Protein backbone atom coordinates (compact mmCIF):
# COMPACT_ATOMS: atom_id res chain seq x y z
CA UNK A 1 0.00 0.00 0.00
CA UNK A 2 1.30 3.45 -0.92
CA UNK A 3 2.66 5.68 1.82
CA UNK A 4 0.34 8.70 1.90
CA UNK A 5 1.88 10.39 4.92
CA UNK A 6 2.01 14.15 4.58
CA UNK A 7 2.99 17.14 6.70
CA UNK A 8 0.56 19.87 7.67
CA UNK A 9 1.88 22.79 9.70
CA UNK A 10 4.48 20.61 11.38
CA UNK A 11 2.18 17.64 12.03
CA UNK A 12 2.74 14.32 10.27
CA UNK A 13 -0.59 12.98 9.04
CA UNK A 14 -1.43 9.44 7.94
CA UNK A 15 -2.82 10.84 4.68
CA UNK A 16 -3.90 14.17 3.17
CA UNK A 17 -7.54 13.34 4.02
CA UNK A 18 -9.14 15.50 6.72
CA UNK A 19 -12.67 14.97 7.98
CA UNK A 20 -14.24 18.35 7.18
CA UNK A 21 -15.84 20.39 9.93
CA UNK A 22 -19.52 19.61 10.30
CA UNK A 23 -19.36 16.24 8.55
CA UNK A 24 -17.86 13.94 11.19
CA UNK A 25 -18.86 15.53 14.49
CA UNK A 26 -15.77 15.40 16.68
CA UNK A 27 -14.62 12.11 15.17
CA UNK A 28 -15.61 9.68 17.89
CA UNK A 29 -19.14 9.43 16.46
CA UNK A 30 -17.72 7.79 13.33
CA UNK A 31 -15.00 5.64 14.87
CA UNK A 32 -16.86 2.41 14.11
CA UNK A 33 -17.79 3.49 10.58
CA UNK A 34 -14.43 4.57 9.15
CA UNK A 35 -10.83 3.38 9.18
CA UNK A 36 -9.27 6.26 11.08
CA UNK A 37 -5.79 4.92 10.42
CA UNK A 38 -6.30 6.19 6.85
CA UNK A 39 -7.47 9.64 7.92
CA UNK A 40 -4.98 12.42 8.48
CA UNK A 41 -7.01 14.67 10.73
CA UNK A 42 -10.41 15.63 12.08
CA UNK A 43 -11.74 19.18 11.95
CA UNK A 44 -14.36 19.22 14.67
CA UNK A 45 -17.87 20.63 14.45
CA UNK A 46 -17.77 24.41 14.18
CA UNK A 47 -17.52 26.20 17.52
CA UNK A 48 -18.56 29.60 18.79
CA UNK A 49 -17.47 31.25 22.02
CA UNK A 50 -20.83 30.49 23.62
CA UNK A 51 -22.96 27.44 22.85
CA UNK A 52 -25.75 27.71 20.27
CA UNK A 53 -28.90 25.67 19.66
CA UNK A 54 -28.80 26.25 15.93
CA UNK A 55 -31.60 26.87 13.46
CA UNK A 56 -35.23 25.89 13.83
CA UNK A 57 -37.21 24.12 11.13
CA UNK A 58 -35.84 21.92 8.37
CA UNK A 59 -32.09 21.45 8.61
CA UNK A 60 -31.15 18.98 5.88
CA UNK A 61 -32.32 18.57 2.30
CA UNK A 62 -30.88 16.10 -0.20
CA UNK A 63 -30.23 17.09 -3.79
CA UNK A 64 -29.42 14.77 -6.72
CA UNK A 65 -25.70 15.39 -6.15
CA UNK A 66 -25.25 16.76 -2.67
CA UNK A 67 -26.77 17.92 0.57
CA UNK A 68 -28.05 21.33 1.65
CA UNK A 69 -27.77 22.04 5.36
CA UNK A 70 -29.07 24.77 7.63
CA UNK A 71 -27.71 23.65 11.00
CA UNK A 72 -26.94 27.13 12.27
CA UNK A 73 -23.63 26.37 13.98
CA UNK A 74 -25.22 24.33 16.75
CA UNK A 75 -22.39 23.61 19.18
CA UNK A 76 -21.61 23.36 22.91
CA UNK A 77 -19.30 26.39 23.04
CA UNK A 78 -15.52 26.64 23.25
CA UNK A 79 -15.15 25.91 26.96
CA UNK A 80 -17.34 22.79 26.80
CA UNK A 81 -15.33 21.62 23.79
CA UNK A 82 -12.08 22.05 25.70
CA UNK A 83 -13.49 20.22 28.73
CA UNK A 84 -15.20 17.34 26.91
CA UNK A 85 -15.03 16.90 23.12
CA UNK A 86 -11.35 17.79 22.75
CA UNK A 87 -10.44 14.93 25.06
CA UNK A 88 -12.31 12.55 22.76
CA UNK A 89 -10.47 13.91 19.73
CA UNK A 90 -7.13 13.50 21.48
CA UNK A 91 -7.99 9.90 22.33
CA UNK A 92 -8.53 9.28 18.62
CA UNK A 93 -5.19 10.93 17.94
CA UNK A 94 -3.51 8.62 20.43
CA UNK A 95 -5.11 5.57 18.80
CA UNK A 96 -4.78 6.48 15.13
CA UNK A 97 -2.58 9.56 14.82
CA UNK A 98 -5.38 11.83 13.57
CA UNK A 99 -4.51 15.51 14.00
CA UNK A 100 -7.05 17.38 16.17
CA UNK A 101 -8.33 20.58 14.54
CA UNK A 102 -10.74 23.02 16.21
CA UNK A 103 -13.00 24.98 13.86
CA UNK A 104 -13.86 28.40 15.30
CA UNK A 105 -16.55 30.83 14.19
CA UNK A 106 -17.76 34.08 15.72
CA UNK A 107 -20.25 36.90 15.38
CA UNK A 108 -17.85 39.69 16.35
CA UNK A 109 -14.11 40.27 16.43
CA UNK A 110 -14.23 40.05 20.22
CA UNK A 111 -15.83 36.60 20.10
CA UNK A 112 -13.24 35.35 17.62
CA UNK A 113 -10.37 36.67 19.72
CA UNK A 114 -11.62 35.32 23.05
CA UNK A 115 -12.40 31.91 21.58
CA UNK A 116 -9.01 31.74 19.83
CA UNK A 117 -7.19 32.67 23.04
CA UNK A 118 -8.95 29.86 24.90
CA UNK A 119 -8.10 27.34 22.19
CA UNK A 120 -4.53 28.62 22.14
CA UNK A 121 -4.15 27.53 25.76
CA UNK A 122 -5.69 24.10 25.08
CA UNK A 123 -4.17 20.87 23.75
CA UNK A 124 -5.73 21.19 20.29
CA UNK A 125 -3.23 20.88 17.42
CA UNK A 126 -4.54 23.42 14.90
CA UNK A 127 -7.16 26.17 14.91
CA UNK A 128 -9.26 26.48 11.75
CA UNK A 129 -10.88 29.90 11.54
CA UNK A 130 -14.32 29.92 9.92
CA UNK A 131 -14.76 33.42 8.47
CA UNK A 132 -18.09 32.66 6.79
CA UNK A 133 -19.92 33.85 9.91
CA UNK A 134 -21.98 37.06 9.67
CA UNK A 135 -20.49 40.22 11.14
CA UNK A 136 -23.32 41.71 13.21
CA UNK A 137 -21.58 45.11 13.18
CA UNK A 138 -21.95 45.52 9.42
CA UNK A 139 -25.48 44.29 8.85
CA UNK A 140 -24.69 40.59 8.83
CA UNK A 141 -22.24 40.47 5.92
CA UNK A 142 -19.89 37.51 6.36
CA UNK A 143 -16.28 38.28 7.30
CA UNK A 144 -15.20 36.12 4.39
CA UNK A 145 -16.76 38.26 1.64
CA UNK A 146 -14.36 41.22 1.59
CA UNK A 147 -10.59 40.82 1.85
CA UNK A 148 -10.18 43.82 4.16
CA UNK A 149 -12.63 42.49 6.78
CA UNK A 150 -11.15 39.01 6.57
CA UNK A 151 -7.62 40.30 6.99
CA UNK A 152 -8.59 42.33 10.04
CA UNK A 153 -10.23 39.46 11.93
CA UNK A 154 -7.38 37.10 11.05
CA UNK A 155 -4.85 39.67 12.27
CA UNK A 156 -6.65 40.00 15.60
CA UNK A 157 -6.92 36.24 16.04
CA UNK A 158 -3.27 35.77 15.10
CA UNK A 159 -2.26 38.11 17.91
CA UNK A 160 -4.30 36.06 20.40
CA UNK A 161 -3.48 32.55 19.21
CA UNK A 162 -0.12 30.81 19.23
CA UNK A 163 -1.43 27.62 17.63
CA UNK A 164 -0.98 26.99 13.90
CA UNK A 165 -3.78 28.95 12.23
CA UNK A 166 -5.70 27.74 9.19
CA UNK A 167 -8.33 30.03 7.65
CA UNK A 168 -11.39 28.48 6.00
CA UNK A 169 -12.58 30.69 3.16
CA UNK A 170 -16.10 31.27 1.94
CA UNK A 171 -16.79 30.57 -1.74
CA UNK A 172 -18.89 33.74 -1.65
CA UNK A 173 -15.70 35.83 -1.36
CA UNK A 174 -15.53 38.68 -3.88
CA UNK A 175 -12.09 37.59 -5.06
CA UNK A 176 -10.53 34.34 -3.84
CA UNK A 177 -6.88 35.11 -4.82
CA UNK A 178 -7.07 38.53 -3.13
CA UNK A 179 -8.67 36.96 -0.08
CA UNK A 180 -5.89 34.37 0.14
CA UNK A 181 -3.22 37.07 -0.03
CA UNK A 182 -5.02 39.16 2.60
CA UNK A 183 -5.32 36.38 5.18
CA UNK A 184 -1.77 35.19 4.52
CA UNK A 185 -0.46 38.72 5.09
CA UNK A 186 -2.52 38.86 8.30
CA UNK A 187 -0.79 35.79 9.69
CA UNK A 188 -2.61 32.70 8.40
CA UNK A 189 -0.37 29.62 8.27
CA UNK A 190 -2.64 27.72 5.88
CA UNK A 191 -5.84 28.15 3.88
CA UNK A 192 -8.82 25.80 3.74
CA UNK A 193 -11.03 25.83 0.63
CA UNK A 194 -13.94 25.89 0.65
CA UNK A 195 -16.91 26.26 2.90
CA UNK A 196 -20.36 25.31 1.59
CA UNK A 197 -21.94 27.18 -1.32
CA UNK A 198 -25.06 29.23 -0.70
CA UNK A 199 -28.09 27.44 -2.11
CA UNK A 200 -31.86 27.24 -1.93
CA UNK A 201 -34.46 24.47 -2.02
CA UNK A 202 -38.19 24.81 -2.70
CA UNK A 203 -40.95 22.68 -1.21
CA UNK A 204 -43.14 22.27 -4.30
CA UNK A 205 -46.23 21.25 -2.34
CA UNK A 206 -46.05 24.25 -0.01
CA UNK A 207 -44.64 26.54 -2.71
CA UNK A 208 -42.11 28.11 -0.40
CA UNK A 209 -38.45 27.68 0.56
CA UNK A 210 -37.64 24.57 2.57
CA UNK A 211 -35.46 26.42 5.08
CA UNK A 212 -36.63 29.08 7.51
CA UNK A 213 -33.64 31.24 6.51
CA UNK A 214 -34.40 30.64 2.79
CA UNK A 215 -30.75 30.02 1.90
CA UNK A 216 -28.47 27.28 3.23
CA UNK A 217 -25.14 25.58 2.51
CA UNK A 218 -24.65 23.13 -0.35
CA UNK A 219 -21.96 20.46 -0.07
CA UNK A 220 -21.21 17.18 -1.82
CA UNK A 221 -20.14 16.04 -5.31
CA UNK A 222 -21.87 18.99 -7.00
CA UNK A 223 -19.43 21.54 -5.59
CA UNK A 224 -16.21 19.57 -6.03
CA UNK A 225 -15.28 20.88 -9.51
CA UNK A 226 -16.01 24.46 -8.43
CA UNK A 227 -13.98 24.08 -5.25
CA UNK A 228 -11.09 22.62 -7.26
CA UNK A 229 -11.22 25.63 -9.58
CA UNK A 230 -10.87 27.90 -6.57
CA UNK A 231 -7.91 25.90 -5.26
CA UNK A 232 -6.25 25.95 -8.67
Where are these regions (language model features)?
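N-terminal capping/small domains of soluble enzymes
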Residues: 1-100, 105-110
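Alpha/beta enzyme core
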Residues: 95, 107-232
Amino acid sequence: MADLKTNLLGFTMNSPIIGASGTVGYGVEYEELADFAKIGGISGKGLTLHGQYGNKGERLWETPSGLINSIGLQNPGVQHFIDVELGEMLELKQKYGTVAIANLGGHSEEEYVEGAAMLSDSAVDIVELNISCPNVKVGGMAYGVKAEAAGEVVRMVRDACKKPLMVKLSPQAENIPEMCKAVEAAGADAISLTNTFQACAIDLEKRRPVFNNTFAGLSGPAIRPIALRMVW
